[in-house]
Regions:
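Alpha-helical membrane-targeting segments
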Residues: 1-20, 44
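Short connector loops at helix/strand junctions that flank enzyme active sites
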Residues: 20, 32, 52, 64, ...
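Catalytic strand-loop segment that frames the active site of acyl-thioester-processing enzymes
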Residues: 20-52
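Short structured motifs
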Residues: 20-25, 85-91, 112-114
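Hydrophobic residues positioned within well-ordered beta-strands of beta-sheet architectures
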Residues: 35-37, 85-87, 101, 125-127, ...
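Hot-dog-fold acyl-thioester-processing enzymes
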Residues: 44-66, 79
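Hydrophobic beta-strand-centered segment that forms part of the acyl-chain substrate-binding groove
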Residues: 68-107
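HotDog/MaoC-like acyl-thioester-processing domains
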Residues: 95, 106-161
């Protein structure tokens, strides 16, 4: 389903798995080529080390590459199924304050995905996510592998991935 940046921002803000973990979409860039996300430290996501629970950090990174590629490609006429295929995470420092990250998808990445979808029908690529605390300290590095494929002839589009 194609939606505006503002509508998806508010939908994601109140999506229960993100809301309950205090994961807050600050903004989607024009045309869904970027997203800025804040992970707020709270009593609901604190671990015994007084830092943000690793599962919360992982959950924060999970949906966004898939959402961005889905919205970008739908706007360009593609009928696709998109999801996160795999992820790796390295906790570099404890997240003792709020964490922040930004994802940007370049025009080159979009063009590459379009070309591969037109010729092969399936696009798989790994992308980095770096999370920083409020002081600019690098706390987390992730690699998210996005999987995009054309819908099969008899396959119906769903809201979920």
């Amino acid at each position: 389903m194609v939606v505006s940046e503002k509508v998806l921002k508010w939908a994601m803000r109140f999506y229960p798995p993100l809301l309950s973990q205090r994961i807050w979409v600050q903004k989607f860039g024009k045309g869904f080529t970027s997203v800025e996300v804040k992970v707020s430290k709270s009593i609901l996501n604190k671990n015994y080390n007084d830092s943000i629970f690793g599962g919360t950090i992982f959950a924060a990174a999970d949906p966004f590459y898939a959402l961005l590629f889905d919205q970008i490609l739908q706007r360009r006429g593609f009928k696709v199924r998109v999801w996160l295929k795999s992820a790796q995470i390295q906790y570099l420092k404890p997240g003792r304050t709020n964490l922040y990250f930004k994802i940007n998808i370049s025009e080159e990445d979009i063009a590459e995905a379009e070309q591969i979808l037109k010729t092969v029908g399936k696009y798989v690529k790994a992308f980095p996510i770096e999370m920083y605390d409020k002081n600019g300290q690098h706390c987390v590095s992730l690699i998210n592998e996005v999987y995009v494929r054309n819908l099969y002839a008899d396959e119906k589009r769903t809201i979920a991935y």
